[in-house]
Amino acid sequence: MYSSIWINSAQPDAADIFSRNLRYLLNRVNPRGKPLAFACIGSANVPGDSLGPLMGTILTRHGLLNVYGTMEWPLNALTLPHNMPLLKTVEKKYCLIAIDAAIGNPAQSGHLTLTEGSL
């Protein structure tokens, strides 16, 4: 079992640590190399909860397909229940990666976490 890893985004090598661990985790949970899909969860109107929709917008602007949740069409507490059947279907064909902000204690502020688990 892969345990969570926390990465301080202020570290100079944070991007390298994140990408190395993401690659490891994807190889572990997606050994057959299924295409990726992204569930970018959050509220576009709440600054502390907009990481998911913001990342979804950036991913779509870079031409990635199978991105669910953008600033224009957020995947949040109101829309997620309606979209769960779609995401369950997507999960059968794709390796689904969830991107979401989390509110934690002040010591966790600015940290990224990678965790294997269900949506």
Where are these regions (language model features)?
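N-terminal catalytic or cofactor-binding beta/alpha core of small enzyme domains
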Residues: 1-119
